[in-house]
């Protein structure tokens, strides 16, 4: 019987080939698993996106639903109350009090912005009246500036007149009016309605931010409004 003996070199070659085949098989299996994992990930992601899209469409459909009756019936649904309810929901979505409870700096900035807006509104109204009557507004500006400073508002003094650094329009009114105007543009054609919606926006904003003044040294917006009105009345009563 002939005995076949493999040389060490041939054995090593066969062993290397076997090892390479195993490595390729392992790599192939690993690649297949990776591809399958990626595929499953995209399937899951696509499913989630689809669910979100459907949810968003349902929400949007509910929010913009009108009765499918006559044209006059559809118009009857769109009233001032619908617009005001939308503005109130927009304010709730902004979540001023929620943000303020988590961020003291935001709460402080909100209080300052609200009081500065009250200051600006009263200043402009009274100054316009005094100027129309030919009355010097400098004493009035000095007095309401001092009131703003005493209220704790930051600002600068120039020519003996203190001006709050955040003086300007109420920063929360614009988002409410703009969003409502975009959704219901037909309701904002009339200037009287525009003014009415702005007054409503100011009202619900003041109600929303009122609790932020409960535990601070600043006066509430209503108290500050009264202080400025009393100052303005001193000058207005002397107008001819």
UniProtKB/Swiss-Prot annotation:
Protein's UniProt keywords contain Transit peptide: no
Q: Which GO terms describe its molecular function?
A: GTPase activator activity; guanyl-nucleotide exchange factor activity
GEF catalytic domain, as annotated region: 78-240
- Keyword Secreted tagged: yes
SUPFAM superfamilies referenced in this protein's UniProt entry, alphabetically: SopE-like GEF domain
Q: Which GO terms describe its biological process?
A: actin cytoskeleton organization
Q: Where in the cell is it found?
A: Secreted
Coiled coil regions in record: none
Q: What domain of life does the UniProt record list for this protein's source?
A: Bacteria
Task: Enumerate the InterPro entries for this protein.
Answer: SopE (IPR005414), SopE-like_GEF_dom_sf (IPR035949), SopE_GEF_dom (IPR016019), SopE_N_dom (IPR016018)
Q: Please give one Pfam family short name.
A: SecIII_SopE_N
Could you list the residue ranges that cross the membrane? none
Q: What keywords appear on the UniProt entry?
A: GTPase activation, Guanine-nucleotide releasing factor, Secreted, Virulence
**What is the role of the protein in this entry?**
Activator for both CDC42 and RAC1 by directly engaging these Rho GTPases and acting as potent guanine nucleotide exchange factor (GEF). This activation results in actin cytoskeleton rearrangements and stimulates membrane ruffling, promoting bacterial entry into non-phagocytic cells.
Family statement drawn from the similarity comment of this UniProt entry? Belongs to the GEF (guanine exchange factor) SopE family.
Q: Which NCBIfam families match?
A: PRK15279.1 (NF011809), PRK15280.1 (NF011810)
Query: What else is noted?
Result: Encoded within a lambda-like prophage region with similarity to GIFSY phages.
Q: Know the name of this protein? A: Guanine nucleotide exchange factor SopE
Q: Which organism is it from?
A: Salmonella enterica I
